[in-house]
From Swiss-Prot:
CC cofactor: [4Fe-4S] cluster
Name of the protein: 4-hydroxy-3-methylbut-2-en-1-yl diphosphate synthase (flavodoxin)
Binding site for [4Fe-4S] cluster: 280, 283, 315, 322
Family: Belongs to the IspG family.
GO molecular function per UniProt: 4 iron, 4 sulfur cluster binding; 4-hydroxy-3-methylbut-2-en-1-yl diphosphate synthase activity (ferredoxin); 4-hydroxy-3-methylbut-2-enyl-diphosphate synthase activity (flavodoxin); iron ion binding
Keywords, alphabetical: 4Fe-4S, Iron, Iron-sulfur, Isoprene biosynthesis, Metal-binding, Oxidoreductase
Pathways involved: Isoprenoid biosynthesis; isopentenyl diphosphate biosynthesis via DXP pathway; isopentenyl diphosphate from 1-deoxy-D-xylulose 5-phosphate: step 5/6
Cofactor mode of binding and number, as noted: Binds 1 [4Fe-4S] cluster.
Any GO BP: terpenoid biosynthetic process
Pfam families registered for this protein in UniProt: GcpE
Job of this protein: Converts 2C-methyl-D-erythritol 2,4-cyclodiphosphate (ME-2,4cPP) into 1-hydroxy-2-methyl-2-(E)-butenyl 4-diphosphate.
Amino acid sequence: MPAVNLGMPKVPEVLAPRRKTRQISVGKVKVGGNAQVSVQSMTTTQTTNINATLQQIAELTATGCDIVRVAVPHQDDADVLHILAKKSQIPIIADIHFQPRYVFTAIDAGVGAVRVNPGNIRKFDDQVGAIAKAAKAAGTSIRIGVNAGSLHPSLLQKYGKATPEALVESAVWEASLFEEHDFHDFKISVKHNDPVIMVKAYRLLAERGDWPLHLGVTEAGPAFQGTIKSATAFGILLSEGIGDTIRVSLSAPPAEEVKVGLQILQSLNLRERKLEIVSCPSCGRAQVDVYSLAEQVTEGLKHVNVPLRVAVMGCVVNGPGEAREAELGVASGNGRGQIFVKGEVIKTVPESEIVQTLIEEANRLAAEMPAGSIGSPEILV
């Protein structure tokens, strides 16, 4: 039987075309328009601890983060932004609450963007004209960051709580103020900790204008819960073409947020797939240690920078057929594994040698592919 490539197609399919938006720049990163969906995170260090903050930014950059946000709760934090902006490998967004003067300090510091919270910055509406003028002169973009937890009291009184309509009304009002001052380089977020309310809010917002949208489920929770919430909400919106940049909020190290965000985008074919482990959940038919094989293969191939799909199959029900139709595969059973290359068995090895043999063959195939290519090889274990 001829081998069939089950890897990524040359032009990955998506569920819906991207929503058409204006494009802005956050430093060197384009957001909206035809730019890829970018992944953001936020540092957890004290911003004034320059070395620790830059170290965390470097770790985020290495993980694949495109844009990083830093907290600016005090004047001392605002005063070090110029150092961070100069030394960071990726654009910095200054996160501003309460004090409008920090916005101007951040713009002068050369950050990529400033996040403003219209719900809690003092007399924010009166400051929009000056902020727009300063940001436009510096080439700094703005994120209008509406959050259910800090919605303006007048909107809470009007709607009774942070409804999708309340979040959108706040965002659209502030957007109109910036546009009145001929400032259009902004994106918008309307975050809520309930994925259902969040999805409804973004759908409403997407109908109101062509602004780039930053997706986020605020206060999503610990790693497991937060991953589920974010994947659910982002999956719905991105599959509808809504969303231009994302941040997965987790009570976990920031690098984990980036890993989850990238995986969500890859799962929707909005980012090129790299290493992907497809493993069976194991059952009473399994004749090898599926869990161990999956973990060892993941570790052994983590350096690979071309699309590799690795499926860990633990029994003879699906293993041989799947392996024969893959570029590279292993059909496991009875303490050994048959190694397939392009549908042909090239060797049978003991179970103890399956992982090493697979990694060697995978590296050989990967070396034949240019970095960043889309397509085979697919690997099945």
